[in-house]
Amino acid sequence: MKKKILKITCIFLLMAVTTFVIFLLCFFQEIRTIKCLKTYDVKDLYSLNYYADYGFDEFIKVGAKNWDECVEYMKKKIAKGLAERIDVLGTNCSSFVVYNEKGEVLFARNFDYTYSPVVMTTTNPENGYAMIGACDMGFLRFAKEGEIKAHRLNLTNATVLYCPYFTTDGMNEYGLAMSVLDCGYAKISTIEDAPTLTTCSMIRMVLENAKNVDEAIKLFKSYNISLEKPNHHFMIADATGRSVVMEYTEDGIVAFESSVVTNFDLYDSRHRGVGQDRY
C-alpha cells in the first residue's frame, strides 16, 4: 500500500515538474519581460525592456479594422490568456518641437487628463528599428496609485505584455519621434487592399520602419487607419528638427509643416475641436 502511494505521489510530482518546465519554456521571454519592469523616483513612471515576441510583423500585414479586432489579436498572440485587462480611453493632449540652447532638437508631449501610470517600453525587433515608446496604462484600466509593482510576476503585471500595442508616442534609434492626439474632425479615405491599423499600432509601424519624416509620410500613406471616436491626428519629427502634422481630410491624408499641435484640426484653418487655449 505504501509503495502504491509513493508511486502515485512520484507520478504527480513528475507531472507537476513537467508542466512547470513546459510553462517556463513556452513563456520564458514573457516572464523575463514582466520581471524586468522597473520603477523610478518619479511617481508612477516605469520602464520595461521587452524581450518577448509581440507579433508586430504579422500584425501589420493583416491589420485590425477597429480596436476590438486589435484586442483579440493581442489576447491570442501576446498574452496567451495571461492577461485580460484591456480598455480603450479617450485623451486630450499637446505636442511640440523646439531647439534648446545647444541647438538640439526636443520633442515634447503631454496628456491632459487624470492620473495614469506610464511604462516606457524599449523594443529591438529583428526586422525593424529599435525604439522606446510610452505606454499609458490608463488605456489598460490602471486608475489607482501603486497598482503596478516593479519586479513582480503576477497577473496584474502581465498586462505590460500589451504595451507595444498601446504606444501613444515614442522615438526610434534614428531620432524619429511620433505622437497621436485627439482632434475634432477627420474624413477617412480608404486605400484599396491596404491593411488597416489602429492609431497606436500606426505609431509603432512608422517608428520601427522609418528613419526620417519623408520615409514616415510615405509609410503613413500606405495604410488605412481605424479612427474611432474621438478622431485623431499625428505629429512626426526627425533628428533634423523637421516636424509635420498628419491629418485626414476631404482631400485625403495631408502632411503639413507645424511645430505645435493640440486637439483641433490645423488643415485649412478649420479649427474644429478643443485645445485652442493650449495652442
Model-assigned labels for residue ranges:
Residues 1-7:
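Positively charged n-region of N-terminal signal peptides that target proteins for export
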Residues 7-211, 226-228:
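N-terminal mature-domain region immediately after signal-peptide cleavage
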Residues 213-224:
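Short, well-structured alpha-helical segments that form the helix of a local strand-helix-strand
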Residues 230-279:
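Extended amphipathic alpha-helical segments with heptad-repeat/coiled-coil character used for oligomerization
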Residues 136-139, 146-151, 220, 259, ...:
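Noncatalytic linker/hinge segments flanking ATPase motor cores
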